[in-house]
Amino acid sequence: MRMGGSFVVLSGVIAIVVGSVLGGCARYFISGAVARRLGETFPWGTMTINVTGAFLIGIFGALATHPGSMFASPNPWLFAVTGFLGCYTTVSSFSLQTLTLARNGEPMHALGNVAFSVGLCLAAVSCGFLLADGLGG
């Protein structure tokens, strides 16, 4: 029985590692592409990452409530949410970029970043949850 428990833990760790690698790479490429396209004077790349991540976690969260969904079992959740989205989204970058805006004499941009990021992320997670819940139910 101990061997089976070790396998479950190891498979969960592998799911997290693979998801983390893919999520980190996706964040790097998408955030960079958005920043190059829209400019780097405002953290559009980080906002895009966090809003799309919120949308995706809404989808996965809704799917996890459906007993037949693959996201109702541990490893797909560990891969997609703990691994991929854990490395894809970033509160630390959001926080540093907001502080940098404020310290650079742009307090309105800093407040705008907070308001838009939080508002858009809450809207995105709600939309993702409603979309997936509607399709799955």
Curated annotation (Swiss-Prot):
The keyword RNA-binding appears for this protein: no
Membrane topology: Multi-pass membrane protein
InterPro entries in UniProt: FluC
Domain of life according to the entry: Bacteria
Cysteine disulfide partners in this protein: none
Keywords linked to the UniProt accession: Cell inner membrane, Cell membrane, Ion channel, Ion transport, Membrane, Metal-binding, Sodium, Transmembrane, Transmembrane helix, Transport
Transmembrane segments: 3-23, 44-64, 76-96, 111-131
Subcellular location: Cell inner membrane
GO molecular function: fluoride channel activity; fluoride transmembrane transporter activity; metal ion binding
A GO BP annotation: cellular detoxification of fluoride
Reactions this protein catalyses: fluoride(in) = fluoride(out)
PANTHER family: FLUORIDE EXPORT PROTEIN 1-RELATED
Homology family: Belongs to the fluoride channel Fluc/FEX (TC 1.A.43) family.
Protein role: Fluoride-specific ion channel. Important for reducing fluoride concentration in the cell, thus reducing its toxicity.
Name of this protein: Fluoride-specific ion channel FluC 2
Gene: fluC2
